[in-house]
Amino acid sequence: MAKTNTVQIKLVSTADTGFFYVTKKNAKAQTGKLEFRKYDPVARKHVTFKEAKIK
């Protein structure tokens, strides 16, 4: 079988609330770290989420 290109990653809130999203990315196409502005329900506002490895 062929190796899959997609890997699961964790998007961790930069507001230090401990909230995170789990998503997938294409490891070959996206070589850098992902960074999104998404809603953090703990902080109740949109903040930057940065990519981290799932342990």
From Swiss-Prot:
SUPFAM superfamilies named among the record's database cross-references: Zn-binding ribosomal proteins
Family annotation (InterPro entries): Ribosomal_bL33, Ribosomal_bL33_CS, Ribosomal_bL33_sf, Ribosomal_zn-bd
One Gene Ontology term, aspect cellular component: cytosolic large ribosomal subunit
Ranges that cross the membrane: none
Pfam families per the UniProt record, alphabetical: Ribosomal_L33
GO MF annotations in UniProt: structural constituent of ribosome
GO terms classed as biological process: translation
Keyword list, A-Z: Ribonucleoprotein, Ribosomal protein
Family membership noted in the UniProt record: Belongs to the bacterial ribosomal protein bL33 family.
Entry protein name: Large ribosomal subunit protein bL33
Organism of derivation: Acidiphilium cryptum (strain JF-5)
Annotated gene: rpmG
